[in-house]
Amino acid sequence: MPMIVDLHNHAERSQNTDLRLEDYVREARRLGLAVAITEHNRLYDRGGVVDGVLVLPGIEVLNDYGDFLVFGAPEDCVAYREIFALIDYVHRCGGVIIAAHPFSGYGVCRAVDPAMAGRIIARVDPVAVLNGRASTDDCEKARRLAMAHGKPGVGGSDAHRAGEMFRMGTRFERRIEGVGDLVREIRLGRCEAVRIETSR
């Protein structure tokens, strides 16, 4: 059964947000969605079903080579500052690493030269092609980048404020019940980025 997960969000353990897990759970329950909490350089410490909503813990790794979302690897992955060492470590742990907002914020295509960005994109798992804080043009460039490298595209709102919640998400062909399912389905490419209609 298909389901939508908003893969990129920040809560009380990120410094630049006033959102809490309860805010996401309340809105996700109304919309019938699941949510990932991806704190800056910290693995969110709550996961599983919370008040009827699936919560998936992840990390947004803020790296000299750009910003990356990680699922299925421990928090100590942030200690790997060299990007290919980080990617290898995440994969050894059985996780996935996502190029977050590659053309906006401190995305990989803004952090390094095009040749290095291409090498990095070739090694990550999917590319975030829809980001709630990125411009339409930057999202389109990310979509083309993912296609050029044969990578799945995923989406997340990157919410830091209430008005930013549940703008973008990722539709999975099969039901996700935990981080293990999420990692497997991303690896198999059984996912696509979607815009979320919050007026439902």
Indicate where each model-derived feature is located.
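Charged catalytic cores and adjacent phosphate/nucleic-acid-binding surfaces used
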Residues: 1-17, 21-26, 45-77, 85-88, ...
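Short beta-strand/turn micro-motifs composed of small residues
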Residues: 39, 101, 157
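Divalent metal-dependent hydrolysis catalytic cores, especially in the metallo-beta-lactamase
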Residues: 6-12, 24-41, 95-98
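Core dinuclear metal-dependent hydrolase active-site scaffold
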Residues: 78, 87-99
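Acidic/Gly/His-enriched mid-domain segments of enzyme catalytic cores or analogous surface patches
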Residues: 99-105
